[in-house]
Structure formats: structure tokens, C-alpha cells
């Protein structure tokens, strides 16, 4: 029963042989020998095409004389003729490029020859040697005898520096004078006065307080170094408004405590005084 089943079953028992053959084939194709042969074939492809074209031309010439020439061979010959024509055109263009290169090389050689011929004529001539006469001994000039007038001038030289002492005294006096003038000039300049800008909140007792009268009372305060500025009424609540007034004071003359004391003297109108803002100018 088992043998009958194996007889009817399609099993490929020789598959390993085909696998080995395929592996050897690809190894030969990818090996170094195959690569070298492909390089040689690629290098000589043009020569083989030319040789094949010549053979086909000779065969076509021999076959065209006979009556049994077929139409298929004539088509192949036409393709070969076109291929040969393109190769001839490429060959002519390469020849033209080679000729141009040869002409350029010949021009360069001629230029080099001209430069080599002209270089010896431009060599710098060696400078002529100058004859130097032997050294002669030079005698020093004879000293003239000193005259009495020159002796008197030498006697006038102050060896102890008395003139320098007088010049030092004059320079010290000049320096002191300049310092005194600078001090006087600096004293005449007005000294910088430190000032501050103060924003006051003056609050009344109730909504029945006359705010115009309150502002008049505040502005009636006149102090040295105090300048009143702008003012406005700011609502507080329940119909009550406070007086917000700005002033500029000199820090050395007017202080915030003094301002508060002077404003709170108006007890009938003023309840309290607060400093809302304080900035140095």
C-alpha cells in the first residue's frame, strides 16, 4: 500500500543535484576568472564589432551578386551599415580632438624654446669691482688756545643749581595760584539741591465737608523749599471724596513730618493725611 502511494506521489528526488549545479554556475559567474573575462570582453567590444561588420559586409557583397539573397539578411546589413557609419563619425571626431591637442603641444614647445633662447640675454651683469685706496691716518685737529672771554663764560656756570631753586619756587607759586583759582571757581558754582516729589491724600471728616475750603487751607501752607502742584478730588465711598494733591519739597528744608503737622492743624476740615507716593528728583 505504501509503495503504491509513493509511486503515484510527485516528489522531486533529484532537487539537490539541480541546486548544486545552480550554485556552481553562479560561483563561476561571480568568480575572479569570470570578472577578468568580462573586463577583457568589454575592452575589445569595439574591435569585435568592427571585425563582425567587415565580415558581414563581405558576405553581403558576395550574397548580393547571387540571385538567392533574402530580405532578412538585407535588414541586418542595413543595421550594420548604420552602426559602421556612427563608428566612423566617432572616429573622425576623436581624430579632430587629437589633432587639436597636438597643435596645442606644438605651440607650447615653441613658446618654451623662445623663452629658453631669450633667457641668457637678460642675465644681470656682475657689478664692476671698485678699487679701494688704502686707509690713511687722519690727524686730529689742533686745539685752539682758550681766550680770556671763554674763561669768563665758564666761570659764570652755576655748579650748585641756584637758578634751578628759583625756577622751582616760581613753579610752586604758579601751582598754588592755579589751585586757589580753581577752588574759588568751584565755590561759585551752585550746589545741587536734593528734591522730592510727594503725593498726599488728605481725607475729610464726612461728605458735608467743603472740599474747596479744605484745598484752600492746604495751599495756604507756605514754607521755604515747598512748592504745591496739581490736585484732584478722588471718590472714596458713600459720597465722600478725598483731596489728592502733589508737591515738590527740598529734602534739607521740608520733611514729611512737618507737612503732616501743618496740614492736620486744620482740624475742622482734615481728618488724616497719608503719603500716597514719594519719589526722588
From Swiss-Prot:
Record-listed Phosphothreonine modification sites: 73, 129, 147
Region Catalytic (GEF), residue ranges: 173-281
Phosphoserine modified-residue sites: 37, 44, 60, 86, 106, 119, 133, 162
Stretches with biased composition (Acidic residues): 149-169
GO BP term, pick one: cellular response to ionizing radiation
Residue segments, region Leucine-zipper: 80-115
Tissue note: Isoform 2 is specifically expressed in brain, cerebellum and testis.
N-acetylalanine found at: 2
Gene3D superfamilies documented for this protein: 3.30.70.60
Triggers of expression: By homocysteine (HC), may mediate accelerated synthesis of free thiol-containing proteins in response to HC-induced oxidative stress. Also induced following exposure to ionizing radiation.
Quaternary data: EF-1 is composed of 4 subunits: alpha, beta, delta isoform 1, and gamma. Isoform 2 interacts with HSF1 and NFE2L2.
UniProt keyword Transmembrane helix present: no
Keyword field: Acetylation, DNA-binding, Elongation factor, Nucleus, Phosphoprotein, Protein biosynthesis, Transcription, Transcription regulation
Region annotation Disordered: where it falls in the sequence: 118-172
The keyword Ribosomal protein appears for this protein: no
UniProt modified residues of type N6-succinyllysine: 117
Family: Belongs to the EF-1-beta/EF-1-delta family.
UniProt cross-references to PANTHER family, sorted A to Z: EF-HAND AND COILED-COIL DOMAIN-CONTAINING FAMILY MEMBER (PTHR11595), ELONGATION FACTOR 1-DELTA (PTHR11595:SF26)
Modified residues (N6-acetyllysine): 17, 107, 117
Sample GO molecular function, one term: RNA polymerase II cis-regulatory region sequence-specific DNA binding
CDD domains in alphabetical order: EF1B
Membrane-spanning ranges: none
GO cellular component terms listed in the entry, alphabetical order: cytoplasm; cytosol; eukaryotic translation elongation factor 1 complex; fibrillar center; nucleoplasm; nucleus
PROSITE patterns reported for this sequence: EF1BD_1, EF1BD_2
Stated name of the protein: Elongation factor 1-delta
Amino acid at each position: 500500500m505504501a509503495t503504491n502511494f509513493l509511486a503515484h506521489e510527485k516528489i522531486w528526488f533529484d532537487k539537490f543535484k539541480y541546486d548544486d549545479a545552480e550554485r556552481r554556475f553562479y560561483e563561476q559567474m561571480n568568480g575572479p576568472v569570470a570578472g577578468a573575462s568580462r573586463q577583457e570582453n568589454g575592452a575589445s567590444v569595439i574591435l569585435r564589432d568592427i571585425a563582425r561588420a567587415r565580415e558581414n559586409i563581405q558576405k553581403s557583397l558576395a550574397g548580393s551578386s547571387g540571385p538567392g539573397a533574402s530580405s532578412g539578411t538585407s535588414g541586418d546589413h542595413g543595421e550594420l551599415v548604420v552602426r559602421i557609419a556612427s563608428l566612423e563619425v566617432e572616429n573622425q571626431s576623436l581624430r579632430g580632438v587629437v589633432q587639436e591637442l597636438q597643435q596645442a603641444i606644438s605651440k607650447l614647445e615653441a613658446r618654451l624654446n623662445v623663452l629658453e633662447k631669450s633667457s641668457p640675454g637678460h642675465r644681470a651683469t656682475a657689478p664692476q669691482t671698485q678699487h679701494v685706496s688704502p686707509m690713511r691716518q687722519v690727524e686730529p685737529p689742533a686745539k685752539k688756545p682758550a681766550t680770556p672771554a671763554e674763561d669768563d663764560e665758564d666761570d659764570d656756570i652755576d655748579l650748585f643749581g641756584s637758578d634751578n631753586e628759583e625756577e622751582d619756587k616760581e613753579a610752586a607759586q604758579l601751582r598754588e595760584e592755579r589751585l586757589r583759582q580753581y577752588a574759588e571757581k568751584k565755590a561759585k558754582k551752585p550746589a545741587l539741591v536734593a528734591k522730592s516729589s510727594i503725593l498726599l491724600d488728605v481725607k475729610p471728616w464726612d461728605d458735608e465737608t467743603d472740599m474747596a475750603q479744605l484745598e484752600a487751607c492746604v495751599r495756604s501752607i507756605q514754607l521755604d523749599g515747598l512748592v504745591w502742584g496739581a490736585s484732584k478730588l478722588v471718590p472714596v465711598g458713600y459720597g465722600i471724596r478725598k483731596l489728592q494733591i502733589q508737591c515738590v519739597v527740598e529734602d534739607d528744608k521740608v520733611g514729611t513730618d512737618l507737612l503732616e503737622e501743618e496740614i492736620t492743624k486744620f482740624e475742622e476740615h482734615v481728618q488724616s493725611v497719608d503719603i500716597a507716593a514719594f519719589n526722588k528728583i
